[in-house]
């Protein structure tokens, strides 16, 4: 054993390490020295220890690691770290610290224990220099040296107890009551009065000082193992009783932030202890340097090193106790509540059952009793009668912690029996893996260990805990108020102790928690290779259906049984695989179930149904424990509570299905499956063929209906999407066919025009050629007519879905498209598709008359011989009744001589003259054919629409090509010309006629 064979004096080596590490390391030299000491103490060979030290210290020392390790082992082997036997400089140092005591202090040879004693007295008496009380105290100490040496050696061998620290703190609190005197005078006189009152107390105080030499080490000391020295609780000291202290059960995973009520008077004594403890007890002692400000204290509000910090914390420091996490976040301080009236300047203690102040973050659960399974992790061993054996066994009025603490991981010792009347068995968490707060190290630690033999593998060890516990009914103790904040609870934002706020399900509520009534902690239940069932929790109701779960879990293996709404919980499910390997594969998968990371998967445990129901917050109705097998044959109402066990075989389930309600339930399951089964199988067989264990499951009807609706909606949504896609494909195909037909039609028309012009120009053509051309024209005419009919037949179908829109919707869509087009054009983006859509909308709007300008009344009814209905007959009817006229004249205008940029605006331009029935624009030849609803509208467009954007368009009537002779054509043309001249009548004249009629009508109405 390298550590015991070579190292003779751990304290001397630690001092040597601190001095050596200080110039080469940014970390705290004292803490790192203890870490190095813990590494060197390991039971390994020198070679292994060197490798271990180099590996572990590389992160701290980096380039200096190798040199330092070699230097360390040389010092250990040569014992050069040991100080010289005498300390000639200590006397001069003492004179420098206490100039007023120079004449009175005896100059004698001092042993190592005497040096420590003097160092401690200097530490306590450093800040307020009052010579008289210190002189008397040092005199009395010198007289007691011989008596105390043996006791000191005993205390050095045995682990120190926490009551000495509490003693000093209580005395400090007692001294702090006087605010009217100066800090130093009050401190000295109180000390003098106490010693004069009780000499035995002074003697015991000297014993405790030797122990405090070890207690003032940093709290993250790596070889610290005794839980008794981890924490202390300041409790009020009653003036007449000096020994009534009670230990408080606190744990290594908690932080205690204490702001004492005597801030003003404890400044220097509590924060000036580090300097001399850090220097060696021998020739390495240096005179004190002026302290710099502590950066951690200024930035965070408190310092993790506490009394051990070498830097200045100011005049009002906050005492931080029991911290094993150096990187802890800042936490507001809270003064402890004392018995009796509070000191001046502080508010009275809070009333019983008052939650912690609002400014404490995160809030702490309300006070309550500790569980019977909590081991006594603090308190001195039994031989001391004035102290309670543990905070758990203390009487109700003792100064125990008013806030429940949590249990550290890995404690396997049995606690002493606790009074069963004070505690309940179901209030505390157990040891287990918490995925939300994993422990860095999972190594088990015994409850009581000797300091010398302690070894830790890591620099910093964290323990897991969960403070989200249900509210307690136990009132807090009046004598102390202690704020204990768990390291995990820093992440919480809602305290579970607040009324009306639901508490988070604690770890013991999880399905795989082994809830036995054993007082100790149970090991995690190891599931055997025969378990094939998985439980799902927190499944959203919309996802908790058979089809979704089957889709996800069938990838891992064969599903034997699948139950949703398991255990009456709409968010629960049970899945059974054919083999254990498949189930393990499913539970080990890193993929989130159904893409939802909140869904939890656990191993299913037989017989845990009743326990889960008692702890599950979702099952609101009380459940009676009863045999599981007969539940299947109960009525539907009864079966809505506990779920039948999944151990029933399908044959038993079929025999139980003779009940009518059971069949009804199975029918609903069939509906829930969406008729997945084959139609040739009966209802019962359908259920069994889909999922073997479905007949064993009792469902909540409300959950079934909701899930069935969700399934139907999702199925219909999928069908709608597919139908929409098919519809779009069909429309696209139809448009392509129509476009192709349109192209063929245009080619035929061009050919027809060419042949007609050929006939007209060549008057001297032979009769044979003329006959051939006429035959070709006939064929072309038939084809053109046929193609036109096909195109027209396809056109209404294309516009049918859009014709449902109202006029307002059409206008809104047109305006929106126009705005989008304008924005994209301004931004310089591609607008071809948007322009095409805009043109189609314009065409549709023009066909429905939405784009017409509405110039005057009756613009659509001003035809030849139009009847006004008032018997006046003012239209140019030529003596023929309007309803008897069949107008076969063309209503389509052929438009040309426009540019590519004008093509989009052409349709709106002509739409203002009337309702457009059809519009065909040839992109290649810049030729358009617009068909109006009536001849009059077409004539108005021909007269007024020829001028477009400052240029003249070429307009011509688009006549349907028929096999007519030139004579008939000549007869038609004068009629058109005549009507064109007639239609040139100004619209204002017609408008005047209308106004005249309105006047007559109004006068006749008045008569």
UniProtKB/Swiss-Prot annotation:
Keywords: Acetylation, Coiled coil, Isopeptide bond, Metal-binding, Phosphoprotein, Repeat, RNA-binding, Ubl conjugation, Zinc, Zinc-finger. The modification Phosphoserine is found at residues 127, 496, 518, 616. There is a cross-link at residues 94, 106 (Glycyl lysine isopeptide (Lys-Gly) (interchain with G-Cter in SUMO2)). The keyword Acetylation applies. Residues 719-795, 823-847 form a coiled coil. Residues 968-1000 have a biased composition (Acidic residues). Residues 106-241, 334-404, 460-519, 853-884, 966-1007 are annotated as: Disordered. Residues 228-241 have a biased composition (Polar residues). Residues 106-118, 134-168, 187-201, 209-227 have a biased composition (Basic and acidic residues). SMART domains: RRM (SM00360), ZnF_C3H1 (SM00356). GO terms for molecular function: RNA binding; zinc ion binding. This is RNA-binding protein 26. It comes from Homo sapiens.
């Amino acid at each position: 054993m390298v550590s015991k064979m070579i190292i003779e004096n751990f304290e001397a080596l630690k001092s040597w390490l601190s001095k050596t590490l200080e110039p080469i390391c940014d970390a705290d030299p004292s803490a790192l020295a203890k870490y190095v000491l813990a590494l060197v103490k390991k039971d390994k060979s020198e070679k292994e220890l060197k490798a271990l030290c180099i590996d572990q210290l590389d992160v701290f020392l980096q380039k200096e690691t190798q040199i330092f390790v070699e230097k360390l082992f040389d010092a250990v082997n040569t014992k050069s770290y040991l100080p010289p036997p005498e300390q000639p400089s200590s006397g001069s140092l003492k004179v420098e610290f206490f100039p007023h005591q120079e004449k009175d202090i005896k100059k004698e040879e001092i042993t190592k224990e005497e040096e420590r004693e003097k160092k401690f007295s200097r530490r306590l008496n450093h800040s307020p220099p009052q010579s008289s009380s210190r002189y008397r105290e040092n005199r009395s100490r010198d007289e007691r040296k011989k008596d105390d040496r043996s006791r000191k050696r005993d205390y050095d061998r045995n682990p120190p107890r926490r009551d000495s620290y509490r003693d000093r703190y209580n005395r400090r609190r007692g001294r702090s009551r006087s605010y009217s005197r100066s800090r130093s005078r009050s401190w000295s006189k109180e000390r003098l009065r106490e010693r004069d009152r009780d000499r035995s107390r002074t003697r015991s105080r000297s014993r405790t000082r030797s122990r405090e030499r070890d207690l003032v080490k940093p709290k993250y000391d790596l070889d610290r193992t005794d839980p008794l020295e981890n924490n202390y609780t300041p409790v009020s000291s009653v003036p007449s009783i000096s020994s009534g202290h009670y230990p408080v059960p606190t744990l290594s995973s908690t932080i205690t932030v204490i702001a004492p009520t005597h801030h003003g008077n404890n400044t220097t004594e509590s924060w000036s202890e580090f300097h001399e403890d850090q220097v060696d007890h021998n020739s390495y002692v240096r005179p004190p340097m002026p302290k710099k400000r502590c950066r951690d204290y200024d930035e965070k509000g408190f310092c993790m090193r506490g009394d051990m910090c070498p830097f200045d914390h100011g005049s009002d420091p906050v005492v931080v106790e029991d911290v094993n996490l150096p990187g802890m976040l800042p936490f507001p301080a809270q003064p402890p509540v004392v018995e009796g009236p509070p000191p001046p300047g502080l508010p009275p203690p809070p009333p019983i059952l008052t939650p912690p102040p609002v400014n404490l973050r995160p809030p702490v659960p309300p006070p309550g009793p500790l569980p019977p399974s909590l081991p006594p992790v603090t308190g001195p061993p039994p031989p001391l009668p004035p102290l309670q054996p543990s905070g758990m066994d203390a009487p109700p009025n003792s100064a125990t912690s008013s806030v429940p603490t949590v249990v550290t991981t890995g404690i396997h010792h049995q606690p002493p029996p606790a009074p069963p009347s004070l505690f309940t068995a179901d209030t505390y968490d157990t040891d287990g893996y918490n995925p939300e707060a994993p422990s860095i190290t999972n190594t088990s630690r015994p409850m009581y260990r000797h300091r010398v033999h302690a070894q830790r593998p890591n620099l910093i060890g964290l323990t897991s805990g969960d403070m989200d516990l249900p509210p307690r009914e136990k009132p807090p103790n009046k004598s102390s108020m202690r704020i204990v904040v768990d390291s995990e609870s820093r992440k919480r934002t809602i305290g579970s102790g607040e009324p009306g706020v639901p508490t988070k399900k604690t770890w013991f509520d999880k399905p795989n928690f082994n809830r036995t009534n054993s007082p100790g902690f149970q090991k995690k239940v190891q599931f055997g290779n025969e378990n094939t069932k998985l439980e799902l929790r927190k499944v959203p109701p919309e996802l908790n259906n058979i089809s979704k779960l089957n889709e996800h879990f069938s990838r891992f293996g064969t599903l034997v049984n699948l139950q949703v709404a398991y255990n009456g919980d709409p968010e629960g499910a049970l899945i059974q695989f054919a083999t254990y390997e498949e189930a393990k594969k499913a539970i080990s998968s890193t993929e989130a179930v159904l893409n939802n990371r909140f869904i939890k998967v656990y191993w299913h445990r037989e017989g845990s149904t009743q326990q889960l129901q008692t702890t599950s917050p979702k099952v609101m109705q009380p459940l009676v424990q009863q045999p599981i097998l007969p539940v299947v044959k109960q009525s539907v109402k009864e079966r809505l509570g506990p779920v039948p066990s999944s151990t029933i075989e399908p044959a038993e389930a079929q025999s139980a299905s003779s009940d009518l309600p059971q069949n009804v339930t199975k029918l609903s399951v069939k509906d829930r499956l969406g008729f997945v089964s084959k139609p040739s199988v009966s209802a019962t067989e359908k259920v069994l063929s889909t999922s073997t264990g479905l007949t064993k499951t009792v469902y909540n009807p409300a959950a079934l209906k909701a899930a069935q609706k969700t399934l139907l909606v999702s199925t219909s949504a999928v069908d709608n999407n597919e139908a929409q896609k098919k519809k779009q494909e069909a429309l696209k195909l139809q448009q392509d066919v129509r476009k192709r037909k349109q192209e063929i039609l245009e080619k035929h028309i061009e050919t027809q025009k060419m042949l007609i012009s050929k006939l007209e120009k060549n008057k001297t053509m032979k009769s044979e050629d003329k006959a051939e051309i006429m035959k070709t024209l006939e064929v072309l005419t038939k084809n053109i007519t046929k193609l036109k009919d096909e195109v027209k037949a396809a056109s209404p179908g294309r516009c049918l879905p859009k014709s449902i829109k109202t006029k307002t919707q059409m206008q809104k869509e047109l305006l929106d498209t126009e705005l989008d087009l304008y924005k994209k054009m301004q931004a310089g983006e591609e607008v071809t598709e948007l322009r095409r859509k805009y043109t189609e909308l314009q065409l549709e709007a023009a066909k429905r008359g939405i784009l017409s300008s509405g110039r005057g009344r009756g613009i659509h009814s001003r035809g030849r011989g139009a009847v006004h209905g008032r018997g006046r007959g003012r239209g140019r009817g030529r003596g023929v009744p309007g309803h008897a006229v069949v107008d076969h004249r063309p209503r389509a205008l052929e438009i040309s001589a426009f540019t590519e940029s004008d093509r989009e605006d052409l349709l709106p331009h002509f739409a203002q003259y009337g309702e457009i029935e059809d519009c065909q624009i040839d992109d290649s030849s810049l030729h358009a054919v617009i068909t109006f609803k009536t001849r009059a509208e077409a004539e108005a467009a021909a007269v007024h629409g020829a001028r477009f954007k400052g240029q003249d368009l070429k307009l011509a009537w688009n006549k349907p090509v028929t096999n007519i002779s030139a004579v008939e054509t000549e007869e038609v043309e004068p009629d058109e010309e005549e009507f064109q001249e007639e239609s040139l009548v100004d619209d204002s004249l017609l408008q005047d006629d209308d106004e005249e009629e309105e006047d007559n009508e109004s006068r006749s109405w008045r008569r």
